[in-house]
């Protein structure tokens, strides 16, 4: 069982047939967001799909709340700068327990590109999702359908590796 979760969100553009639409003003994308929490091997332990206007913090808490029963061994949650704030930390502690530590991975002050240790694991998981053509853009009418296709993509990945 994992003791560290790495959390991130990905904005995905909608097609014209998509039912749920939102706008992510930060990335200027009209579509949905996928929120995932992965272990150190990149396998998902909490997944949520929301409209794009939902903040990263709210979506991560939604994913952790949905999968709370499977996250009893978590001791730390590693996030990027989009998850800074006392309300998120409090929400994680209420959902996963007071012993859980929220760690924010800080960027370099010079704003140069640098790979932040352990953060690349969640980005690699998003890259694995992008290998599935159906997940390049959101064309589903319901968010739950999109969520199930994310689950199927990770399931297919695990089955290919075993």
Language-model segments: residues:
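Basic, amphipathic alpha-helical segments enriched in Lys/Arg and hydrophobic/aromatic residues
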Residues: 90-93, 97-98, 112-162
């Amino acid at each position: 069982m994992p003791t560290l979760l790495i959390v991130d969100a990905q904005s995905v553009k909608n097609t014209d047939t998509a039912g749920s639409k939102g706008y992510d003003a930060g990335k200027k994308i009209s579509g949905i967001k996928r929120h995932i929490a992965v272990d150190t091997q990149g396998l998902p332990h909490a997944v949520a799909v929301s409209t794009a206007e939902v903040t990263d913090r709210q979506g991560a808490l939604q994913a952790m709340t949905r999968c709370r029963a499977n996250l009893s061994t978590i001791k730390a949650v590693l996030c990027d700068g989009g998850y800074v704030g006392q309300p998120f930390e409090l929400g994680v502690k209420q959902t996963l327990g007071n012993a859980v530590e929220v760690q924010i991975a800080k960027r370099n002050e010079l704003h140069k590109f640098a790979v932040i240790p352990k953060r690349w694991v969640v980005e690699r998981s998003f890259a694995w999702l992008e290998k599935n053509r159906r997940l390049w853009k959101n064309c589903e009418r319901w968010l739950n359908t999109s969520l199930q296709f994310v689950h199927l993509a990770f399931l297919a990945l695990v089955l290919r590796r075993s």
